[in-house]
A protein has these predicted regions:
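Active-site-adjacent betaalpha module
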Residues: 1-7, 36-47, 72-185
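N-terminal nucleotide-binding beta1-loop-alpha1 segment
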Residues: 7-13
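Short acidic, Gly/Ser-rich segments with clustered Asp/Glu that frequently serve as metal-coordination loops
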Residues: 14-20
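Active-site loop signature of alpha/beta-hydrolase-fold enzymes
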Residues: 16, 59-60, 162-163
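Short glycine-enriched, charge-decorated loop/helix-capping segments at active-site entrances
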Residues: 22-30, 69-75
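Loop-to-helix element that buttresses phosphate recognition and phosphoryl-transfer chemistry
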Residues: 27-39
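Short beta-strand segments at enzyme active-site cores
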Residues: 49-56
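Acidic/polar short surface loop at catalytic or gating sites that assists cofactor/ion binding
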Residues: 60-78
Length: 185
C-alpha cells in the first residue's frame, strides 16, 4: 500500500502540447513519455494514491493573458487541443469517476498559481508531489518552484517529463536537483 502523503501531478499532457499537429507541440519527445505517465497514474491508483491533472486552459483572443504575446493560441477551452493526449485521454475517461482523480484548470505556468491545488493537497495531508508531463522547463519548472516555496517534497520522473529542446530539458533537470533539492529519478 502506498504512503498516503504523495500525489502524482500530470501537468499539461494535452493534444496541443503533445500531438504531432498540436498548436504548441513538443512532438515526438512529448509522445515518448506517454507510457511512463500511464504507468505512474495506474500505479498511483492501485496504491490508493491521488492523481491530479492540472491542465492549461485559455480563452481565444484573451488580450489580458501574458502568454498571448509569447505563444500561438493553444489549449483553448472546449477544443480538441485542450483534450488529454492519446492514452491519457483513454485513462481519464476510464478513471474520471474515481474520487482520487482530480482535473484542475490552470491559467498560468504553475499549477499552484490562481488554483486551489495547495488547499486540496493539504486537505489530503499530502506533503510530496511527483511531477510528470510537459513542458519540463516551463510549467513543470514553475510548479516545482512553487511546490518548493510551499514546503512540498518534490520528485521528478525523468522519463515522464519532456520539453521543446534538449538544452531546456537538461537545464531544468539540473535546476530541480541543485536549486530545489528535488529527487530526480
Amino acid at each position: 500500500m502506498k504512503k498516503s502523503n504523495e500525489a502524482l501531478l500530470v501537468i499539461d499532457y494535452t493534444n496541443d502540447f503533445v500531438a504531432s499537429n498540436g498548436a504548441l507541440t513538443t512532438g515526438v519527445v512529448g509522445q515518448k513519455i506517454e507510457s511512463e505517465i500511464i504507468k505512474l497514474a495506474n500505479q498511483e491508483l492501485r496504491e490508493d494514491g491521488w492523481v491530479f491533472l492540472p491542465t492549461d486552459v485559455h480563452v481565444e483572443g484573451d488580450p489580458y493573458h501574458p502568454e498571448t504575446k509569447l505563444f500561438p493560441a493553444h489549449n483553448l477551452k472546449g477544443t480538441w487541443g485542450r483534450d488529454f493526449y492519446g492514452q491519457l485521454q483513454d485513462w481519464y475517461d476510464l478513471n474520471k469517476a474515481n474520487q482520487r482523480v482530480k482535473v484542475l484548470d490552470k491559467t498560468r505556468y504553475s499549477a499552484f498559481a490562481g488554483t486551489d491545488l495547495d488547499m486540496q493537497l493539504r486537505a489530503r495531508k499530502i506533503d510530496t508531489v511527483r511531477l510528470v508531463g510537459v513542458c519540463t522547463d516551463i510549467c513543470i519548472l514553475h510548479t516545482a518552484v512553487d511546490a518548493y516555496n510551499l514546503g512540498y517534497r518534490i520528485i521528478i520522473n525523468e522519463k515522464g517529463v519532456a520539453t521543446f529542446t534538449e538544452h531546456g530539458q537538461e537545464w531544468a533537470l539540473e535546476h530541480f536537483k541543485n536549486a530545489l533539492g528535488a529527487q530526480v529519478e
